[in-house]
UniProtKB/Swiss-Prot annotation:
Originating organism: Rhodococcus jostii (strain RHA1)
GO cellular component: cytoplasm; endopeptidase Clp complex
Residue ranges crossing the lipid bilayer per the database entry: none
Main localization, broad class: cytoplasm
Major enzyme class: hydrolase
Name recorded for this polypeptide: ATP-dependent Clp protease proteolytic subunit 1
UniProt KW ATP-binding keyword: no
Catalytic activity: Hydrolysis of proteins to small peptides in the presence of ATP and magnesium. alpha-casein is the usual test substrate. In the absence of ATP, only oligopeptides shorter than five residues are hydrolyzed (such as succinyl-Leu-Tyr-|-NHMec, and Leu-Tyr-Leu-|-Tyr-Trp, in which cleavage of the -Tyr-|-Leu- and -Tyr-|-Trp bonds also occurs)
Length: 220
């Protein structure tokens, strides 16, 4: 399981593991303005869609925040959609994205594809009320901050322990705010990994609805 908070992230970016990646195709678009080369991410951005498909770290957080701010400047009254398929990541990066989501004027629809684990689960819950969604087979994982590997003098350990407790309380109050649950319930539920199906995430208050497949909707 990917931990939400790596103690090493207290001082900076959590280390990134090896990742394999499908090569995105590029394509040519013709318009009245001429010809331009594009790719799926550019096309999504033009439709005011942000896709978070990697771990939450300084690099991905900066990318997401930049897109949020640009889309707000282009049109603050149009919704922004954030698709999420992420194993989670660092606390500071999570809160940077979270604060930016709350800062911009546009409503933000969050949609879970695959998984929203750990930090990504908080971002999923932080979407605008009534606009937090997931596909039927998506899963959501919430848990407490990780504590392993802390070293140093006693005074350093006390400082790090206090910071981990502060982060845990902040995570609990943030989830409580967006789920409607008491922070004490969140603390109990995140004492161990809590894995939720899309339907269970709706019942828990992390999302508002489970999406139907578009094919099925069209057949009705």
């Amino acid at each position: 399981m990917t931990n939400l908070f790596d103690p090493r992230s207290l001082g900076g970016q959590a280390p990134a593991g090896p990742q394999s990646r499908y090569i995105l195709p590029s394509f040519i678009e013709h318009s009245s303005y001429g010809v331009k080369e594009s790719n799926p991410y550019n096309k999504l951005f033009e439709e005011r869609i942000i896709f978070l498909g990697v771990q939450v770290d300084d690099a991905s957080a900066n990318d997401v925040m930049a897109q949020l701010l640009v889309l707000e400047s282009l049109d603050p009254d149009r919704d922004i959609t954030m698709y999420i398929n992420s194993p989670g990541g660092s606390f500071t990066s999570l809160m940077a994205i979270y604060d930016t989501m709350q800062y911009v004027r546009a409503d933000i629809t969050t949609v879970c594809l695959g998984q929203a684990a750990s930090a990504a689960a908080v971002l999923l819950a932080a979407g605008s009320p009534g606009k937090r969604l997931a596909l039927p087979n998506a899963r959501v994982l919430i848990h407490q901050p990780a504590t392993g590997g802390i070293q140093g003098q006693v005074s350093d350990l006390e400082i790090q322990a206090a910071e981990i407790e502060r982060m845990r309380r902040l995570m609990e109050t943030t989830l409580a705010k967006h789920t409607g649950k008491d922070a004490a319930v969140i603390r109990k539920d995140t004492d161990r990994d809590k894995i939720l199906t899309a339907a269970e995430a709706k019942e828990y208050g992390i999302i508002d609805d489970v999406l139907e497949y578009r094919k099925l909707s069209a057949q009705k």
